[in-house]
Amino acid sequence: MAVKLMLHPRNQHREGYDFERLVVKSPELEAFMTRNPRGQMTINFQDADAVRMLNRALLMTHYEIDFWDIPASYLCPPIPGRVDYIHYLADLLAKSNGQEIPHGSDIKALDIGTGASLVYPLTGRHEYGWDFTGVDIDPVSIKSARHICERNGLNIRLKRQNNAEDIFEGVVGSDDVFHVTLCNPPFHASLAQAQEGTQRKWRNLGKGHSAELNFGGQNAELWCPGGEIGFTARMIEQSKNFSEQCLWFTCLVSKKDSLKPLS
């Protein structure tokens, strides 16, 4: 397996996917496996069910999760890239901890937009033992995340954000203190832009548009006014009111070009 040098050095997935090991832990994955032109085992990454089964197998194999699933049409984020964010957060926290990466439940993390998959709390809890609170505006996402917690016996706090204009207000209590907040903001600035983005992906794949084929995601996951630049700008502004309650505020933007308007 080729080493993925773009991934963090501590990322378990730098050497790719060990499909033989994954199938042992999650036999359902085998039905979606195929071979690429080089004869290597893989899946069809344009098949939403295949990607969902791969995520389940990865979480079961590498992160000691016994149960994981998400509702149909909800975002199924790729595990390697998401856990990379967790590892870089650990490096960031080390800068405030004498260059030592902090482990254990004394470290409090707030996941803004935790989603139906709960991927950041699941991976961050396993890799570093941090204590997570997950927040989302979508009730189905909260229900799904809570179901994952219950089936795995996990004590991850979940909160519903009821006001689309607020990011921290209403979910960060007066007594709450966090070492870090994390967020993967909606990328698109409108529903039309999100739909065009999905269609463009399919055109690039030579698939053409299909109502049945999509890359997943609900409205709140895919778009918000101003897109990721607008969302991150609001987060920066609103974070000022909680500066005494959090050490680091962070956000993962998808495009390097988004950084300049935010600087």
Name every feature range the model reports, one short phrase each.
Residues 1-76, 91:
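N-terminal auxiliary segments of SAM/dcSAM-dependent transferases
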Residues 47, 213-263:
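Conserved Class I SAM-dependent methyltransferase catalytic core
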Residues 57-62, 80-108:
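Conserved alpha-helix/loop element of class I SAM-dependent methyltransferases that forms part
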Residues 102-115, 133:
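Conserved class I S-adenosyl-L-methionine
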Residues 106, 177-178, 246:
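Local beta-strand N-terminus motif with an aromatic residue
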Residues 116-130:
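Conserved SAM-binding loop of SAM-dependent methyltransferases across substrates and taxa
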Residues 135-183, 187-191:
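S-adenosyl-L-methionine
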Residues 183-230:
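Mobile active-site "lid"/loop adjacent to the S-adenosyl-L-methionine
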